[in-house]
């Protein structure tokens, strides 16, 4: 926009009116808190979300009902914000537990839920991390069922029923267009897949041991270092953020190859803008892809939200100051955050953020 203002210069004289017009119409990223008071707790449930306490919101999605759904790591709950801005608790007891299949939704107990997703049939999936399982509510949200994991930490079961396989602290889940479920099995340094038709689980990426990932190489015998979060783009490619690896990868499932797109592998505070493969990241724990194909990252340990632009191959820091805090509404890059985790790219172009240790849900938007 600065260069447009310079068009107002004639014979060495700066046209102040041109500059004023440019300044007044310049659009930037803003941020607002849409839920939470900044204090951890559960007070204010069934009231206005902005006046209600939250407790470490992690995964966040827009539901098929138009409501915002999120899971709370600190209270082991699943909650919902309706179109009127009212927050309610859907499931979870406020203490850790491990409910058996068939438990009514309102009576369920979870153990450090990390992420939630909706499938094409209107069923809500829950990453029940410390129970080492992926759970699901029925389409009527009445009963709980397990779709992967035995509840015992470990690694086993490839080639067999997912409900008989062991997982090790699953952190993220996403579904492809066929309804197959992809899991970040971070404790095993693997990405695993549950077939929608057969329920059989297989490993699609990782060796089971942490290590540097070979760029552009086959998925076969290629290690991962802390696979943490997943999302699919419009081409059906799987995007993966690695927590300990501090990198962002694109996986071509048809060709079974993995490509580095961002992150030097060095841990550090991201620059305001940097060439993608030279960018430093610090524990990325959320991935979301917007309608334009940009990949958003919750760079948790730098307390920032980043955007990878595949057209320019750059990583830009959109929100956060790099310091941990609970900043005000306003310009996004002036709002301190506190270990954000969950991200969701909404249909209007805004980004929903689970600002975990600020105990807020925030919305990043461009205006």
Question: Regions from the language model: what does each represent?
Answer:
Residues 67-69, 123-125, 180-182, 237-239, ...:
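Conserved beta-propeller blade signature
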Residues 339-367:
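Blade-level signature of beta-propeller repeat domains, shared across WD40, Kelch, NHL, RCC1
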Residues 62-65, 118-121, 175-178, 232-235, ...:
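Residue-level detector of Asp-centered blade-edge/turn motifs that repeat once per structural unit
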Residues 76-78, 132-134, 189-191, 246-248, ...:
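Structural signal for beta-propeller blades
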Residues 24-56, 86-112, 141-169, 198-226, ...:
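Gly/Pro-rich loop segments of beta-rich domains
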Residues 73, 129, 186, 243, ...:
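Short loop/turn segments immediately following the C-termini of beta-strands
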Residues 81-86, 138-142, 195-199, 252-256, ...:
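Short loop/turn segments that connect beta-strands within beta-propeller blades
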